[in-house]
Amino acid sequence: MSCPMSLSNPSQILLRNSELLVAKVPLFINLPEDGFIEAYTEIHKPDTIHCFNTNFIDYQAITKKHCSPTKTKNVKATFASTYQTTSCHDLVIIAFPKSKAELNFTLAMITHCINDETKIILVGEKKGGIQSAAKLTQHIFSCCQKVDAARHCLLFVGLFQPERLSDVFNLQDWFKKYQITVEGIELTIASLPGVFSQQKLDVGTALLLSNLPSKMTGKVLDFGCGAGVISCFIGKKFSGTNLSLLDVSALALTSAQESLALNGLSGNVFPSNSLSDVNEHYQHVVSNPPFHQGVKTHYQASEDFLAGINKKLNKQGNITIVANSFLRYQPIMETHIGNTRVITKDKGFTIYRAQLS
C-alpha cells in the first residue's frame, strides 16, 4: 500500500507489513504521532488502541489528535514510566529505544498484559542499533525474526517464552543507584534505564555543580532534570531553596523523584515540552540542556528554552547553564535575557550565567 509522506520511516515499514499487524487490542509503545495510528485504524479497525509513551511531547500530540472529547474513544493514551492495564494485548509494537537496557525494561514491564500468543513487533532505524534485536531478546523471546528491511529501518517479530510471563515486574529492581560526592556533599542518585548519565556523574554536570551561584534561595527550576543530580545537590547545599524539576521523559521524572527521596529532599517534579507547562516564576534556573532526541542531535528545544526563559524569571533572577563549548548559546541568552558571562571553560564545556535586569 502507498504511505502518506508525513509518516516516519519506521511507520512506513510497519504499514508495508500491515498483514502482520492484525489485532483487536494493540499496544503501541513510544510510537510518535505521525499519521500511523490513523492509518492503522482505517485498515484494521481495532476495538481499542492503547498508546503508551514515556516522551511527553509524543503523548501530547497523540492526545490532541485522538483523545479530545470530539474524537472517537478507541484510542487510550498513557504518559508514565511504567504501563499498567487490565487489558490483555494481542499485539505490541515497540519503537526500538536508543538504550538497550531500556528495551529489557520495556519488555519486562509488559509481561502482565500479554500472553504467549501476543505478537511483539520491534521497529527502528538501523543506526539506532536495532540490528542487535534478536541477540538482545534471546533470553526472553522464544523467537525473534527479521521480517523486513526498508527505508533504513528494520522490522522484527517475536514471541515471549511462556515461562517469562510469570515474572513479576517490580520498578524498584530497575533503579541503578550510585553515590557521588561533590564539594564534600554526598548524594545517592537513582536512575532508570534510558536516563541520561545513568550510573555516573557526567563531566558537564560536574562542572556546573562546581560553578553555581555562591548563594541560592527561593524558587529554583531544574530544566531537563534527568535523574535529579543538580536539584539534589542544590537542595543539600542551599537549604533555603524550593525545588522544581522538569523533563520531557517520564523515566527521568520517576528517577528524579526517587533521587530526591533518597536524599531526604522534596520538590515539584513535572513534565513539560520545553516551557509549555511552566506556570511559576523562579529566582534561579539551572540546566544542562539536552540536545539529543533519540539518536538524533536536536538543538531547537534548548534554543526555545533559552529564548523563552526570561518570562519565567523573577526580576534579578538568574540562569546558569552548562553546554558543549561549540554550541552558540551565548548570543541567544544575550538577546533574550541580558548580559551573559562565561563563568569558566573546561574539558570542552562552558558555564554561562545571565541575570534578568
From Swiss-Prot:
It catalyses: guanosine(1207) in 16S rRNA + S-adenosyl-L-methionine = N(2)-methylguanosine(1207) in 16S rRNA + S-adenosyl-L-homocysteine + H(+). Keywords: Cytoplasm, Methyltransferase, rRNA processing, S-adenosyl-L-methionine, Transferase. SUPFAM superfamilies: S-adenosyl-L-methionine-dependent methyltransferases. One of its GO terms (cellular component) is cytoplasm. The keyword RNA-binding does not apply. Coiled coil: none annotated. It is found in: Cytoplasm. It comes from the Bacteria. GO terms for molecular function: 16S rRNA (guanine(1207)-N(2))-methyltransferase activity; nucleic acid binding. InterPro entries: DNA_methylase_N6_adenine_CS, Mtase_sm_N, rRNA_ssu_MeTfrase_C, RsmC/RlmG, SAM-dependent_MTases_sf, Small_mtfrase_dom. Its EC number is 2.1.1.172. Pfam families: MTS, MTS_N. CDD domains: AdoMet_MTases (cd02440). Its main location: cytoplasm. The keyword rRNA processing applies. Specifically methylates the guanine in position 1207 of 16S rRNA in the 30S particle. Belongs to the methyltransferase superfamily. RsmC family. Monomer. This is Ribosomal RNA small subunit methyltransferase C. It comes from Colwellia psychrerythraea (strain 34H / ATCC BAA-681).
